[in-house]
Amino acid sequence: MTIEAVLSGAARYAVVCGDNIATLRTMPDACVDSVVCDPPYELGFMGRKWDASGVAYDVERWREVLRVLKPGGHLLAFGGTRTYHRMACAIEDAGFEIRDSIHWVYGSGFPKSLNIGDGMGTALKPAHEPIVVARKPLDGTVAAN
């Protein structure tokens, strides 16, 4: 399905593959009920450039998410344990209300980073993944939304 099909009522959802900010900019204001996303954790994990792109800290990107959400709409954004706080600040700076956090607890942690030359792990092994719970401010009262 396409975004247009959802907006017209012909479909209930759409999965879109593409640059998220470019796609968000094609969407009208206040047309989305909720957003669940898992941006890069900005750790540069295993030397990967995509995981150190600055996307999670990009206030302008979060402002676009805020723009397309309906008043009172929620954002759930997964983050890394060492970088969650910076992402939460960027989300708040974009205009969201930080409502809470959820911690997805794993039975075992993520694999440790490894410097093969040293023969040992070089990072902690977290066993949870923090999730920011944020809300677009309401227009008026809770009952009116």
Model-derived regions: residue spans:
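Core catalytic lobe of class I
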Residues: 2-145
